[in-house]
């Protein structure tokens, strides 16, 4: 389904310093929405076009769906952690989460983007920095 050439990670700034993470009971939808908005703005400044946000499909939710100038659909998982303890934000996208993302993306792709190339990226906010992981995983890896 999704095959795009891997690219090097890109970094930026954008997270307040602190400890712990933003997920679970301590987190909130508004905190998640803030990070998703910041990720969207970061990606738009790098030439990606916004397609959709918080799309619930059979199998899971897609935080952001973007499109590259060449038409590739990019399914973006946004993660935030105050520190890199416990593996950090990017490491929190485990195989179960990847499997749910691929399932949801497949349903979206069939309805809205069939025929387009696609990839899975992660935008991770941690320890005061933003890291963009292009082609973070492949559909056939899960």
Curated annotation (Swiss-Prot):
Molecular function, one GO term: nucleic acid binding
InterPro entries per the UniProt record, alphabetical: Restrct_endonuc-II-like, tRNA_endonuc-like_dom_sf, UPF0102_YraN-like
Organism superkingdom: Bacteria
Ranges for region Disordered: 1-23
One Pfam family matching this protein: UPF0102
NCBIfam families tied to this protein: PRK12497.1-3 (NF009150), YraN family protein (TIGR00252)
Protein family per UniProt: Belongs to the UPF0102 family.
Protein name (database record): UPF0102 protein Bamb_0202
Organism (species): Burkholderia ambifaria (strain ATCC BAA-244 / DSM 16087 / CCUG 44356 / LMG 19182 / AMMD)
Native organism taxonomy: Bacteria, Pseudomonadati, Pseudomonadota, Betaproteobacteria, Burkholderiales
């Amino acid at each position: 389904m999704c095959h795009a050439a891997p690219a090097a990670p890109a970094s930026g700034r954008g997270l307040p310093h602190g400890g712990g993470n933003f997920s679970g009971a301590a987190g909130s939808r508004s905190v998640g929405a803030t990070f998703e908005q910041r990720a969207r703005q970061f990606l738009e400044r790098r030439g990606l076009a916004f397609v959709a946000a918080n799309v619930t499909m059979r199998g899971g939710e897609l935080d952001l769906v973007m499109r590259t100038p060449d038409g590739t659909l990019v399914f973006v998982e946004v993660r935030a952690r105050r520190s890199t303890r416990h593996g950090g934000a990017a490491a929190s996208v485990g195989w179960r989460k990847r499997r749910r993302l691929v399932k949801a993306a497949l349903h979206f792709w069939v309805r809205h983007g069939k025929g387009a190339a696609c990839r899975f990226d992660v935008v991770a906010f941690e320890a005061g920095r933003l890291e963009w992981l292009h082609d973070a995983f492949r559909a056939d890896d899960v």
